[in-house]
């Protein structure tokens, strides 16, 4: 992750996001939040709520993690996902990881997270994330990669992976 672009398995590239990625990132957010499509209202109104929620997430990340690094995941030059991380003093935090629907279930998330784990192993630093209880699929993926539940409440769990050695 420290390189300007890190090559992952199967032609994946994780590169820093650019201002021109805004439309892709907003569209990706919409696909990652199907719950927002259940809002009762005109489609235009729903789109406005999705856009507002995207801005709230972006601002919240900026306020809480001002040094966060934002990446776009590409497969053979096509944007397929996004990753946001924060390299804190005691841990690397995975703040956001999402993929377009067509890229889900292909092992790309695993490859990206293994890249984060490799970077953490090199600096002997744990990796932490928060997974909402409404996302059991993500929870299973993190647990399969060796993350363990460190804190839990009815809404979310804090999962942490510790480097070996």
Model-derived features: positions:
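Conserved active-site alpha-helix within GNAT-family acetyltransferase domains
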Residues: 110, 134-155
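A short beta-loop-alpha structural element at the N-terminal edge
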Residues: 13-38, 150
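Conserved GNAT acetyl-CoA-binding A-motif
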Residues: 120-132
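Conserved acetyl-CoA-binding loop-helix of GNAT-fold acetyltransferases
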Residues: 99, 105-118, 140, 144
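Conserved N-terminal entry element of GNAT/NAT acetyltransferase domains
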Residues: 1-20, 27, 163-165
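Conserved beta-hairpin
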Residues: 69-83
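Conserved beta-strand-loop-alpha-helix junction that forms the acyl-donor binding cleft
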Residues: 100, 104, 129-139, 155-164
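Conserved GNAT-fold acetyl-CoA-binding loop/helix
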Residues: 33-60
